[in-house]
Amino acid sequence: PVMIATSGATLIAEDAIAEMRARLFPLATLITPNLPELEHLAGRTLRDTVEVADAAAEIARTYACHVLAKGGHTDDERIIDTLVGPGEERSAAFGDPRIDTPHTHGTGCTLSSAVATLLGHGLPLEHAVRIGRQFVRRAILAAPGFGQGNGPLGHQAVRNQSPSS
């Protein structure tokens, strides 16, 4: 869902979030909330990776879909994303060192689009998430450095690479 910005600003009305919960989430294969979105969906503050995984599992069970709880909004040196399914405690955890850059605008949308594309190519979900994360990481490293503040990613750096590389 694109519900809450990095700044903490709510991007859509609460009734739209209720509609997403009621109509969209039960149809979804995967939802990819960032930490503020996950906290909003869970209705509580999440203080550590255990609480994040528990909240993601609760949401996965409620909506019978997978949840990729993204860890980019923490202050940790490593970003941990946790993938859980509706019938599992924890499917997988993915971790990488944080890249020190302000050029991260669009990382969540890029990741969810990459995963959806890879699923469309027939890759299993966990593999699609792993490759999608690698794609986003390379795009962050190739960011052109435009403007001030949170700049765009460098998607062009990876356009000619195979989806399985």
Question: Language-model features: where?
Answer:
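Short clusters of hydrophobic/aromatic residues that line enzyme substrate/ligand-binding pockets
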Residues: 11-12, 46, 94, 153
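Phosphate-handling active-site elements
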Residues: 90-92, 118-132
